[in-house]
Amino acid sequence: TPPPANRAQLRPPIVDEMRPTTLDGYASKPSTIATFEAVFPNAYHIRSVLPIPSQEEIRDDGVTFCWCPFDQALREAGPLTKRVLHAMEPHLEGHKRFIYIDTKIQYFRAGDVPVDSQHWHVDGSIVARGPQVQALGHNLLHDMKARLQRPSLSPKLLAYQSSRHCATRFVTVPVSLTMPELIPNFDGLDQAVRTLDPPCEAQPASSIVSFDGLSLHRATAAEDDGWRLWVRCIETDREVHLTRPIINCYGTVFRTLPQ
């Protein structure tokens, strides 16, 4: 891990896709965060459905990736992941500077969760830290207004999940709601979406779906025991530098212990 003085030098410049333009406006404003009318288009589409792999194929695929460049992942992937990446290629838009691959091979017992939250959220949010954020009483803020008001800058994503027993849920219709311009976490957004209860869909087994940084989705608990391969492809202008905490959390299965 580089010393603190060098970490700032390693940080890539902020690209327009990730620029917290709303936060910039708070430099001379009171410390109360305003609300706005947020519209989530929820551009979720099923792009292809592949043959459902066997549990042995998933278990034995062997290699997982964390923010890995697409070309490298394609070279080094196991047989199943390689088939998925080849199937994703025709659906890449090719308008961003970087294409990254994340994958997980996880074994779930019924009730296990693939990530640390089942909140409704969006991927690739604009995250801000620093003195301006601290002046508003937080260590971190997601600039939701900046993302939603500049949809053309959003990252583009593809996702694959192999199995029936643990499927991501996606909202399938546009959703409008009033929310803070800047949020420290997705708790309030999750509550608002659950209250609205919009139509949503579980990603079909062994399907590839497309969505973007304005698409509400959430993890669900596994309904049964078994292996699952999950693959996410993100096209973004943001250059990612991995840190040990990011690597360590990937692939963790979250389980509620009996009381």
Regions found by a protein language model. Give the residues of each.
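C-terminal accessory extensions appended to soluble enzyme cores
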Residues: 242-259
